[in-house]
Amino acid sequence: MTKKLNRFVKSERLLNRRINRAERQAISVGKGFLNVKKYNRFLRVLGPGLVTGAADDDPSGIATYSQAGASFGYGLLWAFPLMYPLLLAVQESCARIGAITGKGLAAVIKENYSKKLLYMSVGLVVVANTINIGADLGAMAATTQLFVDVPFALLACLYALIIVLLVIFVSYKHYAKILKWLAITLLAYPVTALLVGQNWPEVFHATFTISPKLDFQTIYIFVGMLGTTISPYLFFWDTSEQVEEEVAKRNLKKIGEVPNATKRYLHNLRLDNFVGMTLASLTAWFIVIACASTLYANGITQINTAADAARALEPLVQGFPDAGLVAKLIFSVGVIGLGLLAVPVLAGSSSYAISEALGWKEGLYRKFKRAIGFYAVIIASTLVGLAINFLGIDPIKALVFTAVFNGIASVPLLFMIAKVGNNKTIMGDYKNGALSNVVIRLAFVIMTAAVLVLFVSFASIG
């Protein structure tokens, strides 16, 4: 009897242990399922902010950050902690303007300010974008020439044609989802920076210790870094895309309809913006570090060709046969993919601005025949940008010049963003907070000062 009782007790204990283990596994699976759901919800939040962040590291940005690393080593890393909060605040304000008004930036300026301010704002962004389109198309053609012996002009025309056809016949939302994955090639820079072996105390010291020099070349590249990070086209694109995203989700019937901006919606907007701008800034920081430790460290202080820029990635593929060719391939895929992503953003940004200023129907969600003027501006911007490549301008130098011009053009536009974002009549209870006001105004002051110093140093050379 005692033996039977003992066997029963042991069986019961074993059964309890198995039940407990099964419960723990069930809880674990449940938690995993919840984590997957949370992860999926997080991915659904990411939209215009992520695309804007990816487009921020366009070919012009890659060239400018690469030149900063090659020319000055770690010497300009201090710019990133300065630019990062400015970028976050400015782009959050732009996205919020779109979310609250249901309109693009140009439409808001048109309704609330003078025509002089409207045409100045639109004119600046269109000129800056057109130059940027030309430089990006040139960079895509130049990197392709690393592999095929095809005339530069023919390649530039081919890419312009591909982009125009994609914009007209394929939903930008669909092909942007694919092209965003090509941005993964930018991870080659952080990996290269880690593989080369950095003096990390020196890197962080250079990052958090401001040590500006006032010679023309340093100021020129610094203004370029500001301009390619805080770019005019991002202001107009992010504002309009925030509205178009809501139209695509059927939360709005059309652009111009006032959205129901809940606290959750604005929280998601800020999260999307934060993720996009943080990834863009971190990637840019690593590009400078990678080029400093590969190009600058080996005496290559001037990037004259796409092949020069690609050499920064050679340590990543050192063990591969034909490492130089593989490095060029990784670099080219990144430049071409990001160019295909960025050029429609640039042309679309110009088109939103012009269409809103003239009262045309606009939106990438509309079919071509329902927004002919809007798509005509996209086509014209791309073709005029293409034409710049026939002026005999060096494509690599054009990329850096584009970034500098963006820095100059951003100054008056930042003033307008601060003005609109702080206007209670326009924004109601969602106007800029105290911190947002301080940071956006600081962005205006810093970029104005940098541009003025650039002009003064240029005049002193002459």
Question: What residue ranges belong to the model's regions?
Answer:
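Membrane-interface "cap" regions at the ends of multi-pass membrane proteins
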Residues: T2-S60, E245, N260, R264-N268, ...
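Flexible loop linkers connecting adjacent transmembrane helices
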Residues: T64-G69, E92-L117, A142-Q145, K249-L252, ...
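Transmembrane alpha-helical segments of multi-pass small-molecule transport proteins
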Residues: V122, F147-F169, T185-L194, R370-V384, ...
